[in-house]
Amino acid sequence: GPHVVVTGRTTIGKNTRIFQFASIGEDPQDKKYDGEDTELIIGDNTTIRELCTFSRGTVQGGGKTIIGNNNWIMACVHIAHDCILGDNIIMANNASLAGHVTVGDWAILSGYSLIHQFCNVGEHSFTSFASHVNQSIPPYVTVSGEKARAKGVNTEGLKRRGYNPEQIQQVRRAYKVLYRSGLRLEEARVQLEEMAEDHEEIRPWIEFLDTTEKSFIR
């Protein structure tokens, strides 16, 4: 679109569309940045609507901001330095990611949702309108609120992704283990590991618990 600015070491994949007044690949908004040669990588088939702002990475964060394939990014979205986004993500108008945020495949961030730095937004999760998120979000979980809290499983999203009723039921069981059983986190993880032996859809919960460095919404 007209008046788009693409600057810095920025790579844009095939069939990606950028609409007017977007700023793509500008210097990171980080006081530690001192002109280093960092980059922004955007994958294929991604839509970037009007007035979006995407920053390059910082040396301290690995030097790259990465946005995957088939993402739908609506107007006025901000993606800060060193964020890593997977594929098939939806970010609605004015959603914002602070630095070093990771977003998993198929996550949905509703309008005006704000994600604090270093958070991990799990795959297939749903962040409701105007939620303020300062902890990581496990896979499959819906969160909502000015101080975001877990509200259940994103069942509608899973149905749209082709999960069958049995798979969705197992995800709900895993949610109850983590959120309603009263088990300590270590005990809940052991139970999830046992469930994952027969139900592969539980595996993302365990991977999340093993890899997320920030406290998560529980």
Q: What would you call each of these model-derived segments?
A:
Residues G1-R149:
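Structural signal for interior beta-strand "rungs" in well-ordered beta-sheet cores
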Residues N15, F21, K32, D37, ...:
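Terminal amphipathic alpha-helical/low-complexity segments used for targeting or macromolecular assembly
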